[in-house]
């Protein structure tokens, strides 16, 4: 039975890896209220993008850096660091091409927070994080990634055991949204996009990362255990406190 589950998960992972937003009619997917789907947006840049907008390609080295940073934090938290409880079944996060394509489409609007839907045919309620940069000179892509990760990492001072057990966006000392999303055990995949542009004398950038699921208000961020990964079918060799990438976790199922 275990081998069947793992095989099914591997097949689904391959589909996720090679899905593209051009193959799906996102305009037909349901959205809440009057919201519209980011995949239904015109592929051209919005007027908010100023001068010389450019969507940057995230190369393998950039994708690996994002995954490494996220999985480092997940591994650290899963073992009970920062005074947080141990995670029973938190897996290694992998890259998702479809989520990345939707993130790229979102950044072409050059506005961080919107009411756009990001759901796919298989991922019903993706989460997302935005990082906006403004300065005299545009940093290298790696520097933008590191700055975005640092912003989320600083939220370790705000997140508490109580938030892990019953999610909310803010702790006693501030926002926890970015970090809490990165360590959700329902998150199995991530995909990011980056657009840069010139706004007068200022160089600007928007880095958006879509995650396979989002935290639900009042529900656990992750399931707590007595030892790291005690509920994993197989532990990862590199991130030893996490389940392997083949762990069959359903991102659509709430804790």
UniProtKB/Swiss-Prot annotation:
Q: Where are the transmembrane segments?
A: none
GO CC term, one of those recorded: extracellular region
Instruction: Return the similarity comment.
Output: Belongs to the CRISP family.
What InterPro entries would the database entry show? CAP_dom, CAP_sf, P14a_insect
What does the tissue specificity note say? Expressed in salivary glands.
Q: What is this protein called?
A: Tabinhibitin 7
Which residues are the signal sequence here? 1-23
Record's keyword terms, sorted: Cell adhesion impairing toxin, Hemostasis impairing toxin, Platelet aggregation inhibiting toxin, Secreted, Signal, Toxin
Top-level taxon of origin: Eukaryota
GO function term, MF aspect, one: toxin activity
- Please explain the role this protein plays, according to its UniProt record: Inhibits platelet aggregation induced by all agonists tested (ADP, arachidonic acid, the thromboxane A2 analog U46619, thrombin, and snake venom snaclecs (TMVA that activates platelet through GPIB, and stejnulxin that specifically acts through GPVI (GP6))). May act by competing with fibrinogen for binding to glycoprotein IIb/IIIa (ITGA2B/ITGB3).
Which residues does the UniProt record annotate as the domain SCP?
A: 67-211
Position of sequence motif Cell attachment site: 32-34
Which compartments does it reside in?
Answer: Secreted
Q: Which SMART domains match?
A: SCP (SM00198)
